[in-house]
Curated annotation (Swiss-Prot):
Chain positions covered by the region annotation Rodlike tail: 39-539
Coiled coil: 39-520
Function: Myosin is a protein that binds to F-actin and has ATPase activity that is activated by F-actin.
Keyword Kinase: no
Name this protein carries in UniProt: Myosin heavy chain, clone 203
GO cellular component: cytoplasm; myosin filament; myosin II complex
SS bonds (residue pairs): none
GO molecular-function term, one example from the UniProt record: microfilament motor activity
Keyword Coiled coil among record annotations: yes
Organism: Hydra vulgaris
Keywords on record: Actin-binding, ATP-binding, Coiled coil, Motor protein, Muscle protein, Myosin, Nucleotide-binding, Thick filament
Amino acid sequence: RSEYKKMVAQRIGLAVIQRNVRKYLFLRHWSWWKLYTKVQPLLSVARAEDEMRAKEEELEAAKEQLKKDAEAKKKMEEELTEAMAQKEKLYASLQAETDRLITIEDKLLNLQTVKDKLESSLNEALEKLDGEEHSVLVLEEKIQEAEEKIDELTEKTEELQSNISRLETEKQNRDKQIDTLNEDIRKQDETISKMNAEKKHVDEELKDRTEQLQAAEDKCNNLNKTKNKLESSIREIEQDLKKEKDSKMKLEKEKKKVESDLKDNRDKLSETETRLKETQDLVTKREKSISDLENAKEGLESQISQLQRKIQELLAKIEELEEELENERKLRQKSELQRKELESRIEELQDQLETAGGATSAQVEVGKKREAECNRLRKEIEALNIANDAAISAIKAKTNATIAEIQEENEAMKKAKAKLEKEKSALNNELNETKNSLDQIKKQKTNSDKNSRMLEEQINELNSKLAQVDELHSQSESKNSKVNSELLALNSQLSESEHNLGIATKNIKTLESQLAESKNFNEAESKAKLENYNSSNAF
């Protein structure tokens, strides 16, 4: 289709040329035409001088416009340098933020290892504590059984006292039997004294075990509390680390985007510089009508004024962003100080946990020894119970056999009663001592509860401080996002201004090409006229 159009145009042009040649051949010898060919070049030469002067004036105006364009370009280069400096500042802050994140990750790994060690030691301590509690329960059951046996013996002594009052009348006929009974009572007293000694020993062992158990419980409670503290602090640090990683990823993406935009801007500026050089080379060849140049000039002036307005707006926004970045730096410094305080607090807690871990290892060895002693005492108590049951059964048989024969044992039974009362008072004293020890244990428990409440208050304070730090961090992140959005808007505006500048350069190129074409056309026309004039003179 394009070839067809070209052929049609060539055919029309050929017909026009043939018509013009035919007319020229017909009129070339006409006297008026000879006169016109002689006079017309002289008229066109005068008009050409006027046109050349007008073109020179247009050229001066174009040079002034070029100077203005160069000044605008210089301003844009200055703005670009300022943007590059701002970008370097942002890159430095980003690098500092990444370094801080790396240190936080290292601390988190250390805290995780400490947490694992504490959990293992705590589990071992809990297992040993369960074993100690079981052994203490067994000892308490044995003590309760011994107390029940003592109560039975006291009841039997009361029955014997009633039998004594009833058998005083038969005392005279049973002297021989009284001797044998006294021997039996002596043996019974020996067995009772042995049982009391064993009971006292068992009570002392129980007291020691209860004290050790209370100490172990206190240590386990402290370990649990410190573990809970560390777990809460680790969870909070993990959340902060996740947020910091997200912000880091966002900053890296924005950094890449800003770098790509800056690269594009540099390429565009280099292209504009080359175009401006080309325009400077081609400005000397401009020759076009005044109306076209004035219209182009007005369009360029309007575009330049718009660009200057946009540049002023961008400068104002950059100043606002610098103020916001300064405020954000202050907030970050505050948050870093608070984080350092919290890290020092966590290190103190780690030291406490390490000391507690050493105490638990020593406690494990003591627990093993105590378990062996508890097993030995359990066996001895079982043997004593068997022996006591056998002795009590023998005493019952003998007393039942000799009750009918006992007559006169008032004095001996009174002595036995006095002994039993002494033993009873001793048992009561031991019971009072055990009660006092239980009261002390309760007091220790209340003190431990107070300490736990105090630690919980400290945990709440730490949580509140961490919440404040998180709020400051979230504020800084929101400000970062706002700054980034504004930077994106500025980049878009800069790209628009560059696009407008490219359009202006294209318009300048088209004007230059039109000037070159008009100049060539004028030169060709003047040459043709001179040739015609010379040919007419030759004729």
